[in-house]
C-alpha cells in the first residue's frame, strides 16, 4: 500500500485540516493516510483544547486512516526537533511521501537549508535577540528570504531533517488555505485554529469552520484548558524547588531558573509571571515549553534518555489503517504500542504518562494506562 504522511496537531481539527487531508490524498495518490499527531500539549507547550483521543477520533472520522502519537519529547520542542522527531516516526512507518502546508510552497527550501551551512553560528550568542531573529538576519543576508510564517518554518525544518537523515520519502508542500495562522476572527468555512479557539472561549459561533464531529466534541467542553489554571502548580514548584533542581529541568539554561523563581515569588497570576519572565532572548513559546517541563519535573537527562528510544503509540485507525499496520508491522524498527501497561507507564512512555496525568486536571478520561486505540469502522 502506498502511504502519505502528515505532521499535525489538530487543535482542533477544522475544515482547513480536512482540505489538507484531501489534497494529500490527491497529489500523493496514496492508498492510506498516516498522521503523526501531538498528544495533549502542543509544540508551543500549551494544553490542547480537547484531549488526544477526541482529536484522533475526529481525524479518523474525517478520513485519516491512522493516527500515531508524537511523543512529548518530540512534540514540545522548537521547530527543528519537532520536525525531526515527527519525520523519524513517519520514516519508520514506511510512508512514501509527506504533505504539509506552507505559506510559500514555491520556495526552494533545500536551497535555504544549503545557505544555512554558511552561517556564522558563533554570532548567535546575542542576549538581546532570540535565536530565530538572529537566524533570519543571516538567512536574509544569504538568500533575501526570511522565515516568519509558522508553516514555512516547519517546511524548512522538514526539508533539513530529510536532507540530514537521508530519508527517501518525497516532501510535497501545498499552499496553506484560508485565514492567516494568527488570525483571531472566523470569516468563512476555513479559519485558523487560534480563531476557532478564540471563538470558543468567547462563546462565539465556530461551527461553520469545523466538521460536525469536531463541533459536537467541542460543544461538550465546559472550559478551554489554559495555563492560567496550571499556574498554581507551576508557581508552587518554582518556589519550593531548590535552584539546583530547577537547573536540571529540560530547556532550562543561562540562569533562567533564577528569573523564573523570582517571577513566581512576585506574581500571583500567570500573565504577570510571563510578563516578568519574558526577555528579548526568549520567545513566548520557548518559555511555555520550559514551564511545562518544569511543572512535569522532566530533566535534561530524562529527555536525552527517552528520545533515544522512540515508539509508535497508536491512537486511532479505520479498516484501511488496520490493514496498513498489518502490512508494515513485521518490518517496523520501533516498538508498536496499542495499549499502555504498567511497565510501559513506568519506563518507555513515562514522560507521556506524566503529561497525561497533568492534562487530567481538565478531563476525567484516563489518558494512557490501558487505553485502547479508537477503531472507526
UniProtKB/Swiss-Prot annotation:
EC main group = ligase
Q: Which GO terms describe its biological process?
A: tRNA modification
Q: Which domain of life is it from?
A: Bacteria
Please give the catalytic activity noted in the UniProt record.
cytidine(34) in elongator tRNA(Met) + acetate + ATP = N(4)-acetylcytidine(34) in elongator tRNA(Met) + AMP + diphosphate
The terms describing its cellular component in GO are: cytoplasm
Per the record, a Pfam family?
A: HIGH_NTase1
Give a yes or no for keyword Nucleotide-binding in this entry: yes
Location within or outside the cell:
Cytoplasm
Matching InterPro entries? Rossmann-like_a/b/a_fold (IPR014729), tRNA(Met)_cyd_acetate_ligase (IPR008513)
Task: List its EC numbers.
Answer: 6.3.4.-
The UniProt entry's sequence similarity note says:
Belongs to the TmcAL family.
Question: Which protein are we looking at?
Answer: tRNA(Met) cytidine acetate ligase
What species is given as this protein's source? Limosilactobacillus reuteri (strain DSM 20016) (Lactobacillus reuteri)
